[in-house]
UniProtKB/Swiss-Prot annotation:
The lineage of its organism: Eukaryota, Metazoa, Chordata, Craniata, Vertebrata. Gene3D superfamilies: Homeodomain-like, lambda repressor-like DNA-binding domains. One of its GO terms (cellular component) is nucleus. Highly restricted to adult testis. Its main location: nucleus. This is POU domain, class 5, transcription factor 2. It comes from Rattus norvegicus (Rat). One of its GO terms (biological process) is meiotic cell cycle. Residues 1-23 are annotated as: Disordered.
């Protein structure tokens, strides 16, 4: 297989880059790792995007797809190339997907007129916040949409600090091109950009919801293996930690018990477990967990989750229940 090389971006002859008032045509040399079907293509880049954003010769990405990805800065053709996952070491996340790697020009220093730049950043921060709230988007939505459209995902914290003008002027200047392009995309006159934004966010929400459901299901399965018949207090605690309704957790354990072949005709006895006390003598125990993990119930005045290997075994209908050797952890879910 041929070795990989970085793609080169250079302006067409005759374009000096100074004083231009529109998209600048750029030539993108096809890297060796692209398909042979891909010929040298053209990418329209707005003046100042490369020099004004990258702190140096850094590699950024343009999402691949079945049709040309159009935005108000121009057209980035793609679709006939091999997919290649691109990533970089940065404090920000990278949009998960294949990219055409592009190398932008080195960064330009801040203009000498700092006061004018500061006023521009203040105006941009206000405009960003106003547009985002008008459209009903969260700060995380804006950051993800920027990554989906332009190849660089910005975190919710970054958008929040930009709107509050808590970033340094240099960092705000670096984010300026991407955020201005996003504002142009969601302009009320650009219906195509707004529709594309909605599609991107819908797909993102579906992925986040599916990921959250997988984490919850995996955690509930671990809990079931350790305690197939939790008490009402345990169910309430699980629901609180997983941010679920108590009825959903109770139904899940009931259905899982039926799948595992556990008897379910003694529901009345199961409902009275909390009133009659723990199923075995000793202090109140919610779940047998691996050593080192303890959760506290505020109403019990101490640790309610004890290590598995205690002096009192955990009986389940006359049989001892073994527990996995790994430490059980509850996922941290984001709203």
């Amino acid at each position: 297989m041929a070795g990989r090389r970085s793609s080169n971006v250079c302006p067409f002859p005759g374009n000096s880059g100074g004083g231009l008032e529109g998209p600048v045509p750029m030539r993108v040399d096809t890297p060796t790792w692209l398909s042979s079907q891909a010929a040298t293509s053209r990418l329209m880049v707005r003046p100042g995007m490369g020099p004004g954003f990258c702190p140096g010769p850094e590699v950024w990405g343009v999402p691949l797809g079945p049709s040309p990805y159009e935005f108000r800065g121009g057209i980035a053709p793609y679709g006939a190339y091999e997919t290649r996952t691109w990533s970089q070491n940065s404090s920000e996340d990278t949009y998960p997907g294949p990219y055409i790697a592009l190398r932008y020009m080195p960064n330009l220093a801040l203009p000498e007129d700092v006061s004018a730049i500061q006023k521009e950043m203040e105006q941009l921060a206000k405009e960003l916040r106003q547009k985002r709230m008008t459209l009903g988007y969260s700060q995380a939505d804006v950051g993800f949409a920027v990554g989906a459209m332009f190849g660089k995902v910005l975190s919710q914290t970054t958008i929040c600090r930009f709107e509050a003008q808590q970033l340094s002027l240099a960092n705000m200047w670096k984010l300026r091109p991407l955020l201005k392009m996003w504002l142009e995309e969601v302009d009320e006159k650009n219906l195509l950009g707004i529709c594309r934004m909605e599609m991107i966010l819908q797909q993102a929400r579906k992925r986040r919801r599916a990921s959250r459901e997988r984490r919850i299901g995996s955690n509930l399965e671990k809990l079931f293996l350790q305690c197939p018949e939790p008490t009402p207090q345990q169910i309430s605690y699980i629901a609180g930690r997983l941010r679920l309704q108590k009825d959903l957790v109770q139904v899940w354990f009931s259905n899982r018990s039926q799948m595992a072949g556990w008897p379910t005709n003694d529901s009345s006895q199961r409902e009275n477990v909390g009133a009659t006390g723990a199923p075995f003598p000793g202090p109140p125990v919610c779940f047998p967990l691996a050593p080192g993990l303890h959760f506290d119930f505020p109403h019990y005045g101490g640790s309610c989750l004890t290590p598995l290997y205690s002096s009192t075994p955990f009986p389940v209908r006359g049989a001892l229940l073994s527990a996995p050797t790994t430490t059980l952890g509850l996922p941290r879910l984001s709203s």
